[in-house]
Structures are given as structure tokens and as C-alpha cells.
Regions:
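Short loop/turn microsegments at loop-to-beta-strand junctions
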Residues: 25-26, 48, 169-171
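N-terminal "domain-start" segment that seeds a small globular fold
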Residues: 19-41
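Conserved helix-turn-beta segment immediately C-terminal to the redox Cys motif
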Residues: 46-47, 55-56, 60-84, 103-107
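Non-catalytic, surface beta->alpha helical segment in thiol-disulfide oxidoreductase systems
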Residues: 182-202
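Bacterial N-terminal signal peptides that target proteins for export
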Residues: 1-7
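Thiol/selenol-based redox catalytic cores and closely related redox-interacting motifs
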Residues: 108-188
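Thiol-based oxidoreductase modules, predominantly thioredoxin-like and allied folds used
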Residues: 77-94, 109-121
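Hydrophobic h-region of N-terminal signal peptides that target proteins for export
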Residues: 11-18
Length: 202
């Protein structure tokens, strides 16, 4: 009985320590569009805007706004990071090389792009699993475009909103200089809409 109680106390203590462990973006690594390992600890002290992207989406023109933000504020500490993904309407069918060329030629993208990966499901990259565990889905808002997105996804799955994961291309996560997620923005929120919140963190 004593041993069982002792083991129970030890297990509870270990669980408490594990649950209290503070995870930041700096604990993760990813593969770049060029196939190189990216250690996110290298971004310590930066404000990060992490976005899942696609080349053939109605939201693809947001690349313009993302690049504008990056150019305007990179010298003050902002880094925009794109994660191409083909999970939503198969709107990112290209190879990593084709994606890079598309972004550069059509939108002049100079901010970092990661290798194409899943952001939901069994094969989701660990960064996005962590991002949406920190900031779960909380709705598209009351704008006309938000209602349109809600209607579209509800037709496919009436319970879609109960899951914390990514709902569509160009979901954005804003992280502070300590690597913590401070806000999540759904695709209907444009890069221009984020500027004041980004500036507040710089």
C-alpha cells in the first residue's frame, strides 16, 4: 500500500512538472524551402508572424500584404515565415522549388519559406500542432467573408468549429519576442489589419 501510494505521488509530481513546462517556438526546428534545417531558436528576440500559405487560393494575394509588412518592419525585428500547405482544396500542388518561384515572381516574396508540409492531422508538423494548441480556433467573426467561410466549412462538417486546428490557408499566428503565441488570426483577417498589433510588439 505504501509503495503504491508513493508511486502515485511520484507520478503526479512528474505530470505536474511536465504540464508546467513552458514551451516556446524556440523549442522547434523545421525544414526550409531549400531543404535546410531551420532552428527556431535562431529567431530569439524577434517578433514572428507564422502563416500557412497556398498558391492557388482566394487568399493568395495576401502574399502582397505579408511581404509589405516584412519589408517595412524587418529592421525593427519582424520576421514573417510562410509554411506552404496543400491540405485545403489542394491549392498548393507545386514542389518546393515551384512554390518559391511562384512567390518570388508574382509577389516578390523575400521572407523565409519553409518546405511544404501538413498543418493538420497525423502528419502535421509539430510547429502548427503547438501553435493551435496555444491558440485554438475561435471562429471567423461576423464579417461577410467570415460568415461565408463558416457557411462553406459547415456544409462539409457541421462540427468543424469544435476542433482547435487550422481551418484554411493563410491562418496567421503572431508571436512576441519571447517566442510565445499572443494571437491567432483567421484567413479573413488581412495582413494590413495586423499592423497595429505587430507594431505594439516591436
Amino acid at each position: 500500500m505504501f509503495i503504491r501510494r508513493f508511486l502515485g505521488i511520484v507520478c503526479a509530481a512528474m505530470c505536474l512538472l511536465s504540464c508546467n513546462k513552458t514551451t516556446t517556438i524556440y523549442d522547434f526546428k523545421a525544414e526550409s524551402n531549400a531543404g535546410e534545417e531551420v532552428n527556431f531558436a535562431d529567431y530569439k528576440g524577434k517578433v514572428l508572424l507564422i502563416v500557412n500559405t497556398a498558391s492557388k487560393c482566394g487568399f493568395t494575394p495576401q502574399y502582397d500584404g505579408l511581404e509589405d509588412l516584412y519589408k517595412k518592419y524587418k529592421d525593427k525585428g519582424l520576421v514573417v515565415i510562410g509554411f506552404p500547405c496543400d491540405q485545403f482544396g489542394h491549392q498548393e500542388p507545386g514542389t518546393n522549388e515551384e512554390i518559391e518561384e511562384f512567390c518570388r515572381v508574382n509577389y516578390g516574396v523575400t521572407f523565409p519559406l519553409m518546405a511544404k508540409s501538413d498543418v493538420n492531422g497525423e502528419n502535421a508538423n509539430d510547429i502548427f500542432k503547438w501553435l493551435y494548441s496555444e491558440k485554438p480556433f475561435a471562429g471567423f467573426g461576423d464579417s461577410d467573408r467570415g460568415k461565408s467561410m463558416d457557411g462553406m466549412l459547415s456544409r462539409g462538417n457541421p462540427d468543424y468549429a469544435s476542433n482547435p486546428d487550422i481551418k484554411w490557408n493563410f491562418t496567421k499566428f503572431l508571436l512576441d519576442r519571447k517566442g510565445r503565441v499572443v494571437a491567432r488570426f483567421e484567413p479573413v483577417v488581412t495582413p494590413e489589419d495586423l499592423e497595429s498589433q505587430i507594431v505594439a510588439l516591436l
